[in-house]
Amino acid sequence: MSLCKDSIYILMSNLYSKGMAYLFYFITAFLLGTEAFGILKGLMPIADTLTIFFSSGIPPAIAKFLAEEKEVDINKYIPILYLMILLSVVGFILTPYIKYILGGHYLNLPNILYFAVGLCVVASTVIAFSRGILQGLLKMKYLSLTWIVEYTAKVILVFILTLYLGIFGSLLSISLAYLVGGIFGLYLIYKALKGKFDFKKLIDIKNTTKNIFSNFNLDILRYSIPIALTSSSYRLFGDIDNIVIMSIMGGFWSGIYGYSSLISRGIFMFASAVSIPLLPRISKTKDLSLLKEGIIQNTIFSSIFVIGCLFFPEIPLIAFFKTANPEGILCLRILAISSLFMSYYTLISSALQGLGYAKISFYIILFGLVLNIILNLILVNAYGIVGGSLATLITSISVFLIGVFAILRIKKHII
């Protein structure tokens, strides 16, 4: 199956998932109000970052190892799932202490919200594992179905749970959706392998956990560390502005900024549609022409979206959130450009990981994260939420340029 066809499958699921994600946030914005929605937006990047770091960083490593195997034996990957669960429990325990690092308005939030965030980390393990296997098998059609099921469940659950449990209910709906998607993902693995996936071994905790720290598992874990650090840093990088705004300015302005930030992130559905199948294919072929093909596809997919955000920013703001705050409009224009540069870096990062240079990708995004934190702390204090968007734009351009330089240097060695 070609990269283009794989990308179309992922794009279609991402279009659906992004649409459902907008519906998820629309429902929470409608039910919670701007300030409570701002608190949710301030917690979501924390939940996502911890989920990636303690759980979802391993699946790309699984995909790489699996894609390089001549004879596939899925059952030997089962102990990895238990290792992921163990790491996620550590993340759950550490979550309540995050507020002391974030400070500001985060200190005023009840602990139950932080426990809800921790629950998201634990619940994500099964769906993350199944996606790693499906990606490694190059079953992109099945992989795309896991997103569809997850987001469908999330939207169904969020309305009821948010209505009765508020912000806690919104976070709980995410955990339950992870579980539903994870169980469905295991079924898809069984279907893809035509019954060769041993469910008995999956639930045989006693024997499976004996191999949890095998050399094979540790090799995957070691490879996943820079990927997990890169991905979690990348996620934190993308929303450090919202976190700083929440900490310094509180829930209301975090909500206003969150509206614009959420819409601008729509560009990433195009980039992820290309980057997900790009990693295992470059890992197999070491062909950088695939990166060029991916960049062209991303440009075609993203151009209309960016133009719309630049010239008609008030339309999506009013359509989705019934508000068009002047600061929010300006932020959306700036963030659309920023997201375009970061979408290109998403492809560059996947190429670096596929070529075995995951550490370089991590160093680049770590530099970007530190720069973004510094700029946000300065500019948010000086210019409010507009300062947050300017800080993100400056950092995005810097990260993109460094990524291009790294790829050009590596290309010389390959040639």
From Swiss-Prot:
Pfam families: Polysacc_synt. It is found in: Cell membrane. The chain crosses the membrane at residues 20-40, 43-63, 78-98, 109-129, 155-175, 243-263, 300-320, 328-348, 360-380, 388-408. One of its GO terms (cellular component) is plasma membrane. InterPro entries: Poly_Biosynth_Transport, Polysacc_synth. Keywords: Cell membrane, Membrane, Transmembrane, Transmembrane helix. It is a multi-pass membrane protein. Belongs to the polysaccharide synthase family. This is Uncharacterized membrane protein MJ1375. It comes from Methanocaldococcus jannaschii (strain ATCC 43067 / DSM 2661 / JAL-1 / JCM 10045 / NBRC 100440).
